[in-house]
Amino acid sequence: EATALMNDTAKAAAAAMKSFSKMSSAESSATCLKCHEGSQGNAEERFNYRRSEHARHGVSCNDCHSSHAPKRTEFLLKNTEPNLCYTCHAEQKASFSKPFHHKVPEGGMKCSDCHNQHGGFMGKSLRNSVNGDSACVKCHADKQGPFVFEHAPIKTEGCQSCHTPHGSTNPKLLTRNLVRFLCIECHSNTPGLPGEPLGDQTPSSHDINNPRYQNCTACHIQIHGSNVDRRFFR
């Protein structure tokens, strides 16, 4: 009797897999969402899936999860992160191979630590931190503020105005190879007058051609924001 029951279960599973294989992406996901959608648990995880980047590009639940024979038992995933993500996002694998990168290949963090693979409500499917700021400040809380003197690009454009999120050939994941090149993208031909943005007109005692004065952050050390100095000296 037990053997017959197991055979019936196997047949039912095979029939289910066959029927899923014939479904469109939207149809198969709709079947999953009959149970896996709504306010139970972490609603952000699945509630926005129908409007997510994955859903809009035809990625179904079955592309990442295997309900009957998963390679990974955790979340029934077909593969581990980041290899599962690299199936589609191959360009990011190249980014993580650069000399400076977030420790995703080493297993120090996962793609899903920053991105909500089921949608979420932030751009680029980023996860919202507890207090509503970007995914970055969950780890880099000391850069968050609020500060008495804010560095405007951080508030208006975010961390990616200076940093690349996945990997870079530049230290600190900067978008430019030298700090001064990054700074003069904004601070160029602007006089450093009181109440005005700081400019590239350095004091006469600071010869900008001297390597000693070419690293802006040697003096402007609190570049993310300061509570005591509008010039970010401290």
Regions found by a protein language model. Give the residues of each.
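Short sequence/structural segments immediately N-terminal
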Residues: 1-234
